[in-house]
Amino acid sequence: MKKLITLMVGLLIAVSSNAQIQRPKLVVGLVVDQMRWDYLYYYYNEYGTGGLRRLLNEGFSFENTHINYAPTVTAIGHSSIYTGSVPAITGIAGNYFYQDDKSVYCCADPSVKSVGSDSKEGQMSPHRMLASTIGDELQIATDFRSKVIGVALKDRASILPAGHAADGAYWWDTSAGHFVTSSFYMNSLPKWVEDFNKENHTAPNFDIKSTPEGVTMTFKMAAAAVRNERLGKGKETDMLTVSISPTDIIGHKFSTRGKENHAVYMQLDKDLAEFLNMLDKEVGRDNYLLFLTAAHGAAHNYNYMREHRIPAGAWNYKETVKSLNDHLQQKFGIAPVMGEDNYQLFLNDSTINAAGLKKQDVIDASIDYLKQDPQFLYVFDEEKVTNVTMPEWIKERMENGYFRGRSGEIGVVTRPQFFGGSESPQFRGTQHGQPFPYDTHIPFLLFGWNVKHGSSNVETHIVDIAPTICAMLHIQMPNGCVGTARY
């Protein structure tokens, strides 16, 4: 009988051991800022075999992934990818937005100090993001035994993906010419970061963010984090979030078809191939799960489009603000429009209250005036967008992109390919932020651990990325998640 009991206990232990949850050793989230989905194929024949083509040829591609909110900008994209949520819930309503009648930056936090430099570039944290991230949920699932690290040149592209419970987030201080962090995470830089900065710094104020070299610097820092933090070497799954910022900055300056854009994507492909080889060696080819996506897309340059007889143009939002304020000055005796951002107009509550006016009257008068402008397809009260006659898919994106107290009171939808800016025959750049496919259609690739080669054209959304990764890890999805697991 004792032998039988011993045998049964042994079998139970063996079954229990074999039934342990299987997870990769490392999860890598890679965001390429302003990467339109079609860049996967526009440059395909020029890519090498070890970078983007390797992801396409060995991984799984969700070919029809769209952003399901507007405005489509960097901070919102990064927060939505990792929270599986939208601005209406996360509170990240733009890169910049107005709060209490003041313009604020999404990650600015005067309560923390810069670590690694004497500038204010490190006074940043995720405190304005109201939802958890993949990394936060991974930490909770492992009782905070996992390591989560964020790396990017842009602060918001490192801070928001890494989340609230990250072990570290590092970004580039242009004035110092090296990577920094904030006291939100730590009181001093780890020795490996100090050593990296000594070997990989630039001259102070050199704008590496707008060069292909910035891509290389980001991947070098990410590789250093893998090696020195020993990511993927512990008992629990670790996470590394990486964002490539120069693709966005170069795109803004030179648009989607310039030689500069070509150069940065060739550099991206080369550096990605080396990064994947490093992961193969350091973590193991089948031990890491990587996903690649983008924070948003971009419109083609309007001069380029016009050369081919395709309607396009620029909306001079500064002129609209001035014109609207002039109109409201004549009607009410005040000029309450503080400015435009994210295709929204922001009103100054203090100015309206001091004049003894009802805010709704000012909003209604503003909308009536703006509707006369043929540049706009729709002008609406953000609080009442559900009552506006417009296609449901646009309405849904407007609703998802609105956060009371941080978004503007008045929203506008311009004609397709008409983005915010000034008209100039010399203008070579581009913008993003609209609800149309050129801004919303982004890549979403899975690669590595437990991923079979394939593709899908089923409509998928940016908010589906986080629940997909969490489902693969068998952990809870982020607490504000509205997406669906797709793999």
Model-inferred region functions:
Residues 86, 94-236, 245-252, 371-374, ...:
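His/Asp/Glu-rich, glycine-adjacent segments
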Residues 62-82, 150-158, 243, 289, ...:
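Short, solvent-exposed turn/loop segments enriched in Gly/Ser/Thr/Pro and often Arg
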Residues 1-23:
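Bacterial Sec-dependent N-terminal signal peptides
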Residues 319-357, 431-473, 487:
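Substrate-binding rim/cap in mid-to-C-terminal beta-strand-loop elements of soluble/periplasmic
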Residues 47, 64, 73, 96-123, ...:
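Secreted, luminal/periplasmic, and some membrane-associated catalytic domains
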Residues 20-60:
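Active-site-proximal N-terminal segment of extracellular/periplasmic enzymes that hydrolyze or transfer
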Residues 53, 131-140, 342-379, 450, ...:
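Non-catalytic, well-ordered alpha-helical segments in soluble enzyme domains
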Residues 39, 209-234, 247-288, 469:
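A long, amphipathic alpha-helix that forms part
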